[in-house]
Design a protein with these regions (language model features):
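N-terminal intrinsically disordered/low-complexity leader segments
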Residues: 1-10
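Generic hydrophobic, amphipathic alpha-helix propensity
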Residues: 12-20, 37, 62-70, 136
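Helix-turn-helix
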Residues: 15, 23-57, 61
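Short amphipathic alpha-helical elements of helix-turn-helix/winged-helix folds
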Residues: 19-23, 99
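Short coil/turn segments at alpha/beta junctions that flank glycine-rich nucleotide-binding fingerprints
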Residues: 26-30, 81, 103
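Short helix-capping/turn signature of helix-turn-helix
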Residues: 52, 112-118
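Amphipathic alpha-helical packing segments from all-alpha helical-bundle domains
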Residues: 68-79, 83, 87, 91, ...
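Short, hydrophobic secondary-structure boundary micro-motifs
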Residues: 108-112, 122-124, 152
Length: 194
């Protein structure tokens, strides 16, 4: 990757990120035209490849950028510092909703990339998933007060159960053409308060 990408104004960087998220979220890795990404970002295809050596590098950069954006937002929200599960979930929800508002296609891109089978990107995606899954589980459970739960409850399994249910909900919502962030917020608040 050409470091000149980071010298671009933030607005231009975000235009390229959002264009990549959008196009890759609509197609498989292989069938995503880089010309559409360039057009959506308002740059030429040759300039896109000036910043990113090839399509694979752009795709994997976007994948890692999603993880970075998410981790930074969650850490900034303070959700990992909470000892109460529901306070933690609420703060995490607000952080993720803000991400969805700023990067409307990022969630769909993440879900598509998570299930992508193209051998060009699959090994790198799987390696990254393993790295971040360990971080996420350990960080979330680190500060929870076990006294707030039934004795003997497996906190990690409880967390994974809620994570998988959330992922299923998001996957269902992503099957529609347009994500309604306000609807997602209302549904998750109902689930947290249930």
């Amino acid at each position: 990757m050409n470091k000149k990408f980071f010298a671009l104004p933030v607005q231009k960087q975000e235009a390229i990120l959002n264009a990549g998220f959008c196009v890759f979220s609509q197609n498989s890795y292989k069938k995503s035209p880089t010309s559409e990404i360039a057009d959506a970002a308002g740059i030429s295809k040759s300039l896109l490849f000036h910043y990113f050596y090839n399509k694979r590098e752009l795709y994997l950069f976007l994948w890692e950028k999603c993880a970075q954006i998410t981790m930074e937002a969650l850490e900034k929200s303070g959700c990992y510092e909470q000892t109460d599960l529901f306070d933690s979930m609420n703060l995490g929800l607000q952080a993720k909703l803000e991400i969805m508002r700023r990067y409307p296609h990022m969630g769909t891109f993440v879900m598509k990339a998570y299930y992508e089978k193209d051998p060009d990107v699959l090994p790198a995606i799987q390696e990254s998933i393993a790295k971040y899954a360990d971080f996420k589980t350990n960080t979330v459970l680190l500060n929870l007060n076990p006294e707030h739960f039934i004795e003997g409850l497996d906190l990690e399994m409880m967390y994974l159960d809620m994570l998988w249910a959330s992922e299923g909900y998001i996957w269902e919502k992503l099957q529609h053409d347009h994500i309604n962030v306000d609807e997602i917020e209302a549904d998750f608040i109902k689930l947290i308060d249930f």
